[in-house]
């Protein structure tokens, strides 16, 4: 049987990189590209070592564990033991998740690809059956995206609704600070980009927008407000109109602004939620003034930039 070592190594390098990306996504870790490449290279080097006298070492469970430790440390670094074990166990979780999915899909479709000693190869002679290679190359990324979306759904369901949070939004050179309420009833998205929308009371935006522009937005229909705001309004290029439908109402439009950066501060962590829109409400959101914004629960699925200990 011919084995194209360079092709197998390249595939495993890509798969290791995807596993490390999934691990980082699960833990909300920010990983530098050079660390990701380094970790994936070390992981894929097992393929090369299997054809050397070191093969018994890398095939032994202790050898595989040692490689996993090195991969995790190179990719995520080492700060403390708790941090390290979180990374290691999550890496194994991602590996078992993807490996189980591949085995399940293999059993279902009866593909000719197999996993041997942690390395994915094909049973065909030569370069392999095009269908089996298509399964490997297409199936793994598809399973990766499927797993990522399911993890996002689980995170959204586990969010503690009705929790109060602090929100910092950067618009141009100015920063807005508001108190927000995480509300499961807020399921408003931009229908084109699927960007979640948080709602903020317009009074909080007046110091940033200016008095004249705030009056226009407050007293006119969103469609008319866009027409009346002239080029002197510095946030005109960031304004969006989002269609929505309230209970017992016909289709309406909500005027939104695209922030440059948004940070949400919960009791446990600070979350970067840059992919969002700020919907402008002309009515007060809380009668007793306990909060000034309604936070879309999907925004809490962003990357944690700091954990509160």
From Swiss-Prot:
GO biological process per UniProt: asexual sporulation; proteolysis; sporulation resulting in formation of a cellular spore
Domain of life: Bacteria
Subunit structure: Self-associates. Interacts with SigE. Interacts with SpoIIR.
Biological function: Probable aspartic protease that is responsible for the proteolytic cleavage of the RNA polymerase sigma E factor (SigE/spoIIGB) to yield the active peptide in the mother cell during sporulation. Responds to a signal from the forespore that is triggered by the extracellular signal protein SpoIIR.
Family: Belongs to the peptidase U4 family.
Membrane topology annotation: Multi-pass membrane protein
Disruption phenotype: Does not affect the localization of SigE.
Protein name: Sporulation sigma-E factor-processing peptidase
Subcellular location per the Swiss-Prot or TrEMBL entry: Cell membrane
EC supergroup of this enzyme: hydrolase
GO molecular function: aspartic-type endopeptidase activity; peptidase activity
NCBIfam families according to UniProt: spore_II_GA
Source organism: Bacillus subtilis (strain 168)
Transmembrane in keyword set: yes
UniProt keyword annotations, A-Z: Aspartyl protease, Cell membrane, Hydrolase, Membrane, Protease, Sporulation, Transmembrane, Transmembrane helix
Pfam families membership: Peptidase_U4 (PF03419)
Keyword set includes Membrane: yes
GO cellular component, one term: plasma membrane
This enzyme's EC code(s): 3.4.23.-
Transmembrane segments: 7-27, 36-55, 61-78, 88-105, 130-147
Active-site residues, as the UniProt record annotates them: 183
């Amino acid at each position: 049987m011919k084995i194209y070592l360079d092709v197998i190594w390249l595939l495993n390098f890509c798969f290791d990189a995807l596993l490390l990306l999934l691990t980082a996504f699960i833990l909300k870790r920010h990983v530098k590209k050079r660390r990701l490449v380094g970790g994936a290279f070390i992981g894929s080097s097992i393929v090369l070592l299997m054809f050397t006298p070191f093969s018994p070492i890398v095939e032994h469970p202790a050898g595989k564990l040692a490689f996993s430790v090195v991969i995790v440390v190179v990719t995520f670094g080492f700060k403390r033991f708790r941090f390290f074990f979180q990374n290691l166990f999550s890496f194994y979780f991602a590996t078992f998740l993807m490996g189980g999915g591949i085995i399940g899909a293999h059993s279902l479709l009866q593909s000719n690809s197999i996993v041997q000693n942690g390395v994915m190869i094909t049973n065909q002679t030569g370069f392999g059956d095009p269908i089996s290679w298509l399964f490997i190359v297409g199936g793994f990324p598809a399973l990766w995206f499927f797993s990522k979306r399911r993890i996002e759904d689980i995170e959204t369901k586990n969010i503690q609704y009705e929790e109060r949070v602090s929100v910092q939004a950067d618009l141009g050179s100015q920063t807005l600070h508001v108190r927000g309420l995480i509300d499961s009833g807020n399921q408003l998205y931009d229908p084109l980009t699927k960007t979640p929308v948080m709602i903020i009371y317009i009074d909080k935006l007046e110091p940033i927008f200016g008095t004249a522009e705030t009056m226009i937005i407050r007293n006119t229909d969103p469609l008319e407000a866009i027409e009346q705001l002239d080029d002197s309004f510095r946030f005109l290029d960031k304004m969006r109109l989002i269609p929505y439908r309230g209970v017992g109402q016909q289709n309406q439009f909500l005027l939104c602004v695209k922030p440059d950066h948004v940070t949400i501060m919960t009791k446990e962590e600070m979350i970067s939620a840059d992919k969002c829109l700020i919907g402008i409400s002309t009515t007060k959101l809380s009668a007793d003034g306990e909060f000034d914004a309604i936070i879309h629960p999907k925004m809490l699925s962003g990357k944690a930039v700091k954990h509160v200990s």
